[in-house]
Regions:
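Distinct, well-ordered alpha-helical segments
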Residues: 75-78, 105-110
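Conserved small/polar residues in nucleotide/adenosyl-binding loops
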Residues: 169-170
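A cross-family glycoside hydrolase active-site/sugar-binding cleft signature
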Residues: 16, 65, 95-99, 119-121, ...
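Conserved alpha-helical substructure of the radical SAM core
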Residues: 1-93
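Glycine-enriched alpha-helix->loop->beta-strand junction motifs that scaffold or abut catalytic
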Residues: 112-117
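Glycine-rich S-adenosyl-L-methionine
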Residues: 134-151
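Conserved radical SAM core fold
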Residues: 17, 69-71, 100-104, 120-136, ...
């Protein structure tokens, strides 16, 4: 069993599966960011091995994050593996934090592989402000993805980054 310096049990792990993202949010990433070379990023097999090791050490909850996890090639293999662990009662939960741009495409696959809740990063409901924050994101695509997830029975929590120039009007 893993424990922190105060002897509290560690049963949750956040796994960043990529540093890549299909948006360039002003508070997160510069437009000209240099991504890690592919050879320095964990392979899907290495991520699965890491999950298995931490599961054996007592971690029962996993959250996939990024960058944007749904742009990671073969990420569904990781989600399928987590679902297999869940079906074997080895883990309690696996979730995902996403910007929502690919959610409409993946909602049914996520639900079919045991994802019951997700966090969606959404910083404005104003299409122009959203595009300004994300550089080229389309708010409608994210909203459609959120509706798709909800229609699949996935619980959706919205994360918003409050910035100094963010007006309550937005």
């Amino acid at each position: 069993m893993l424990a922190d310096q105060f002897k509290r049990k560690i049963d949750y792990l956040r796994v960043s599966v990529t540093d890549r993202c299909d948006l360039r949010c002003t508070y997160c990433m510069a437009e000209d960011v240099t991504f890690l070379p592919r050879q320095e990023v964990l392979t899907i097999e290495e991520i699965i091995k890491l999950i298995d090791v931490f599961n054996e050490l007592g971690v029962k909850k996993f959250r996939l994050t990024g960058g944007e996890p749904l742009v990671r090639k073969n990420i569904i293999s990781v989600i399928e593996h987590l679902f297999e662990l869940k079906k074997q009662d080895k883990i309690l939960e696996h979730t995902l934090t996403t910007n929502g741009t690919n959610l409409e495409k993946y909602s049914q696959i996520l639900k079919n592989n045991g994802i019951n809740r997700i966090n969606v990063s959404l910083d404005s409901l104003n299409p122009e402000k959203y595009k300004e924050i994300t550089k080229w994101g389309k708010l409608e695509k994210v909203i459609n993805g959120i509706h798709s997830a909800i229609n699949e029975g996935i619980k959706v929590k919205i994360n918003t980054v409050l910035t100094q120039d963010l007006s309550l009007i937005h």
